[in-house]
Swiss-Prot record:
Organism per entry: Saccharomyces cerevisiae (strain ATCC 204508 / S288c)
Homology family: Belongs to the heat shock protein 70 family. Ssb-type Hsp70 subfamily.
Binding site residues for ATP: 16-18, 73, 205-207, 271-278, 342
UniProt-recorded name of the protein: Ribosome-associated molecular chaperone SSB1
Source superkingdom: Eukaryota
Region of interest (Nucleotide binding domain (NBD)), ranges: 2-391
Region described as Lid domain (SBDalpha): 516-612
Catalysed reactions, semicolon-separated: ATP + H2O = ADP + phosphate + H(+)
Subcellular localization, as worded in the UniProt entry: Cytoplasm
Enzyme Commission code: 3.6.4.10
InterPro entries: ATPase_NBD, Heat_shock_70_CS, HSP70_C_sf, HSP70_peptide-bd_sf, Hsp_70_fam
Short sequence motif named Nuclear export signal, residue ranges: 574-582
Gene name in the database record: SSB1
PROSITE patterns: HSP70_1, HSP70_2, HSP70_3
General remark: Present with 170000 molecules/cell in log phase SD medium.
Lineage: Eukaryota, Fungi, Dikarya, Ascomycota, Saccharomycotina
Length: 613
């Protein structure tokens, strides 16, 4: 890599199933990985020798299912006892354990049992995306804009920001995926001077968002947003997998539920069938020797696939209705409906959406896999002052808080301070008081959600306001100040008005929230793993070089024509050096240095022997 640091910031779409990275240097470029693919699987695999990330990890998943981790985005910022985590754990081949209420992934790596938080796994994927960008730019990358589903809550946003920090990136901004896609659309095929309402329908591998934006010139104002952080292509694959499992059991009497390798192979076949059915109406699924020597073969029509996922497909219209209702806009006022995310390629999803908008033609002009990273790169260029073109110079992004924020009051009532769809950044205030005479401490539990009963919302954390002057109940004036930054992350302050006493917290004991010490420790660990990866690669390279050199010299020594030209003494010296080199290859775990020394030693003897012929 050339010296120097990239002055801009890369845009990373950190996806559930695939990730994508883009950079802006006078224009946006989506960067391909070393395999030439413009999207990289969000997979990390651990083996006795090394760690693999991206395509290499996904390609060996069937051989190493228990130590191949994916779907980290479905764990990040969630509690272990979260209903969706418990449901997902039944389908994942890797092990998830409970550590202080947080889900942690347990794997075998370098012949030891290791545990990683979802943030650390996501950080490994982010590091990979950073390296892909560095290989193209030729400079060190330090800054990034990372995208998250619009419907991610505070804990999920903070955990994603922490993942960025662990990967060694300065995360300038966390932006919402549909908003990033809207930028890509507004600067690309959807370029227009007229004011319009645009609905972004973003259905990816694991998450689903709908955002309604008003675009006027370079000002993008999000009017409302809704979604489901646990709906996407993975769920359609799971339904297909269950169907195929039942079919295999019916035909053979064999149940593959507990065989991680068979499940992985069948899931891969299900995913392939799903993709194929977007362009044809029937496909055949074949998996040789799936389980107990029995082959699996099945014919699947598009109609059957649609039937298996009918309820999920239909559920995608609920957030569409919600955003229209929240923005107080009728569907006839929507000028464009833009498709984003790989799962919007499914014909039935497109038909349901088009029918909902009375046969409206859907906008398919932007690449559904790349639009989010594109928008993030534009935002990165704006934040680092690298955007020079007129169209990006005046671009302004006004996003919203996806869920209401507030405090728990007496009787578990939810007191909303920041209503959902409030434009961020924002500061909102609300006054409270004491419930008992002479009460000197009030606890403020902070929640996020839309339910009246606090217990049905997400607890983000709690704090105490102490040393309140003794007064009759209802007299003290306590003000809660909620500050939401441009990343959608919350800071809360409470003040007792008569004394000015305040308690200021950035929610500390929230789920999935890492302390700065924990982040620092994980950053150091990430560096160690990276160093171990590099050492392994060097060793592998040194071994390959030595093996191929040994093979070529062995050929020389055994070739009667070539060996006859060597003096007898020289030949025996080469054979002795060859034997030393072979011994180095036989050592159980030789270092790259030992292998290099063996190669240099052999080369020295051979060069000397050849020159004295």
């Amino acid at each position: 890599m050339a010296e120097g640091v990239f002055q801009g910031a890369i845009g990373i779409d950190l996806g559930t199933t695939y990730s994508c990275v883009a950079t802006y240097e006078s224009s946006v470029e989506i960067i391909a990985n070393e395999q030439g693919n413009r999207v990289t699987p969000s997979f990390v695999a651990f083996t006795p020798e090394e760690r693999l990330i991206g395509d290499a990890a996904k390609n060996q998943a069937a051989l190493n299912p228990r130590n191949t981790v994916f779907d980290a985005k479905r764990l990040i910022g969630r509690r272990f006892d979260d209903e969706s985590v418990q449901k997902d754990m039944k389908t994942w081949p890797f092990k998830v354990i409970d550590v202080d209420g947080n889900p942690v992934i347990e794997v075998q790596y370098l012949e030891e049992t290791k545990t990683f938080s979802p943030q650390e796994i996501s950080a490994m994927v982010l590091t990979k995306m950073k390296e892909i960008a560095e290989a193209k730019i030729g400079k060190k990358v330090e800054k990034a804009v990372i995208t998250v589903p619009a419907y991610f809550n505070d804990a999920q946003r903070q955990a994603t920001k922490d993942a960025g920090a662990i990967s060694g990136l300065n995360v300038l901004r966390i932006i919402n995926e549909p908003t990033a896609a809207a930028i890509a659309y507004g600067l690309g095929a959807g370029k227009s001077e007229k004011e319009r309402h645009v609905l972004i329908f973003d259905l990816g591998g694991g998450t689903f968002d709908v955002s309604l934006l008003h675009i006027a010139g370079g000002v993008y104002t999000v009017k409302s947003t809704s979604g489901n952080t646990h709906l996407g292509g993975q769920d359609f694959d799971t339904n297909l997998l269950e169907h195929f499992k039942a079919e295999f059991k019916k035909k053979t009497g064999l149940d593959i539920s507990d065989d991680a390798r068979a499940l992985r192979r069948l899931r891969t076949a299900a995913e392939r069938a799903k993709r194929t059915l977007s362009s044809v109406t029937q496909t055949t699924v074949e998996v040789d020797s799936l389980f107990d020597g029995e082959d699996f073969e099945s014919s699947l029509t598009r109609a059957r696939f649609e039937d298996l996922n009918a309820a999920l497909f239909k559920s995608t219209l609920e957030p569409v209705e919600q955003v229209l209702k929240d923005a107080k806009i009728s569907k006839s006022q929507i000028d464009e409906v833009v498709l984003v995310g790989g799962s919007t390629r499914i014909p039935k999803v497109q038909k349901l959406l088009s029918d909902f908008f009375d046969g409206k033609q859907l906008e398919k002009s932007i690449n559904p896999d790349e639009a989010v990273a594109y928008g993030a790169a534009v935002q990165g260029a704006i934040l680092t002052g690298q955007s020079t073109s007129d169209e990006t110079k005046d671009l302004l992004l006004l996003d919203v808080a996806p869920l209401s924020l507030g405090v728990g009051m007496q009787g578990d009532m939810f007191g909303i301070v920041v209503p959902r769809n409030t434009t961020v950044p924002t500061i909102k205030r609300r006054t409270f008081t004491t419930c008992a005479d002479n009460q000197t401490t009030v606890q403020f539990p902070v929640y996020q959600g839309e339910r009246v009963n606090c217990k049905e919302n997400t607890l983000l954390g709690e704090f105490d306001l102490k040393n309140i002057p003794m007064m009759p109940a209802g007299e003290p004036v306590l003000e809660a100040i909620f500050e939401v930054d441009a990343n959608g992350i919350l800071k809360v302050t409470a003040v007792e008005k008569s004394t000015g006493k305040s308690s200021n917290i950035t929610i500390s004991n929230a789920v999935g929230r890492l302390s700065s010490e924990e982040i620092e420790k994980m950053v150091n660990q990430a560096e160690e793993f990276k160093a171990a990866d590099e050492a392994f690669a060097k060793k592998h390279e040194a071994r390959q070089r030595l093996e191929s050199y040994v093979a070529s010299i062995e050929q020389t020594v055994t070739d009667p024509v070539l060996s006859s030209k060597l003096k007898r003494g020289s030949k025996s010296k080469i054979e002795a050096a060859l034997s030393d080199a072979l011994a180095a290859l036989q050592i159980e775990d030789p270092s790259a240095d030992e292998l290099r020394k063996a190669e240099v030693g052999l080369k020295r003897v051979v060069t000397k022997a050849m020159s004295s012929r």
